[in-house]
């Protein structure tokens, strides 16, 4: 440590302070550690060229910063985005995203009067069941999602094609890992881009959001549910193991409490009554490629912020 303090041109006084703090309860260890620190420092000063071109400066830039992983941020973003259903199957490195959603749903998705859960987190028997549950919940009016990794995307592809052509919104989090097939669950890679963009056979082209840090994981997670409802299609939030499982230092997460959910072209009873022609689920009245949908028999999630 003493040698590195010189090679990296670090403030020597910092190490003296840290040693004194570390061994404050064991005063007899302070002097030997300071002596060892000085031995390393003096050796470099007398025998090696220094500094080596790299410099570590005192970091005093933590104001307004938090420490959070991409998966936890995305799970929180799903709660703020109005998600009430998470259907998932355990797979590294996405499992902690589903667990993060459940953690925050227990705080924000419980009825204060009755104590009843206003959410469901379902660990399915496999990836096919997970995506099927997520699509079914969205078809029934809920905001639902699943979280998986590359092997799961392969297994979910046919269901994703169904959601695409039936125009059913669903959000899929793909926390990428390394290699084809089972691959390397504990290694990071960004190799699912095309697999997500064109998931399923046939003419499918999916919406993808690619955050660059956990702060954007939170923001893009909430955004994904609005996009899925507005466009009536699957939306992918694609991250990787490094971002998903590791804690990053990022700016504090921000949320506009006046923000409302965008449920897209949803017709209620009043809107249906005013229609001059018969409602058609796949009738493109506006000519923008997005048809109206009726959830009149359902209870929609509230539009107020959590």
Question: What role is predicted for each listed range?
Answer:
Residues 7-9, 27, 95-96, 179-181, ...:
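Short, well-ordered, mixed-charge alpha-helical segments that flank or form enzyme active sites
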Residues 10, 34-46, 206-262:
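Structural signature of the thiamine diphosphate
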Residues 14-199, 205-206, 211:
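Thiamine diphosphate
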Residues 245, 249, 256-263, 268-289:
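Active-site loops and adjacent core secondary-structure elements that bind or stabilize anionic groups
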Residues 292-294:
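Acidic, proline/serine/threonine- and glycine-rich low-complexity intrinsically disordered segments
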Residues 296-302:
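Conserved small/polar residues in nucleotide/adenosyl-binding loops
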């Amino acid at each position: 440590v003493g040698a590195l303090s010189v090679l990296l041109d670090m403030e020597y006084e910092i190490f003296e302070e840290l040693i004194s703090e570390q061994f404050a309860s064991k005063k007899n260890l302070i002097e030997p550690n300071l002596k060892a620190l000085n031995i390393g420092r003096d050796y470099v000063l007398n025998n090696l060229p220094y500094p080596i071109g790299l410099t570590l400066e005192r970091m005093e830039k933590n104001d307004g910063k938090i420490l959070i992983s991409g998966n936890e941020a995305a799970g929180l973003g799903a709660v703020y985005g109005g998600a009430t259903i998470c259907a998932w199957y355990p797979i590294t490195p996405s499992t902690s995203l589903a667990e993060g959603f459940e953690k925050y749903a227990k705080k924000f998705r419980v009825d204060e009067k009755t104590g009843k859960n206003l959410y469901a987190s379902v660990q399915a028997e496999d990836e096919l069941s997970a995506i099927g549950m997520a699509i079914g919940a969205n078809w029934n009016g809920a905001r639902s999602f699943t979280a998986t990794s590359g092997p799961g995307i392969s297994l979910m592809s046919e269901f994703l094609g169904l959601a695409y052509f039936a125009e059913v919104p669903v959000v899929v989090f793909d926390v990428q890992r390394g290699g084809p097939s089972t691959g390397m669950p504990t290694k990071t890679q960004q190799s699912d881009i095309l697999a997500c963009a064109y998931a399923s056979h046939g003419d499918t082209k999916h919406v993808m959001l690619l955050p660059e840090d956990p702060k954007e994981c939170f923001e893009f997670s909430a955004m994904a549910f609005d996009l899925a409802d507005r466009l009536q299609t699957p939306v992918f939030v694609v991250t990787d193991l490094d971002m998903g499982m590791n804690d990053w230092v990022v700016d504090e997460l921000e949320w506009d409490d006046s923000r409302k959910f965008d449920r897209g072209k949803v017709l209620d009873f009043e809107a249906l009554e005013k229609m001059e022609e018969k409602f058609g689920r796949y009738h493109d009245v506006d000519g923008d490629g997005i048809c109206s949908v009726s959830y009149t028999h359902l209870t929609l999630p509230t539009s107020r912020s959590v």
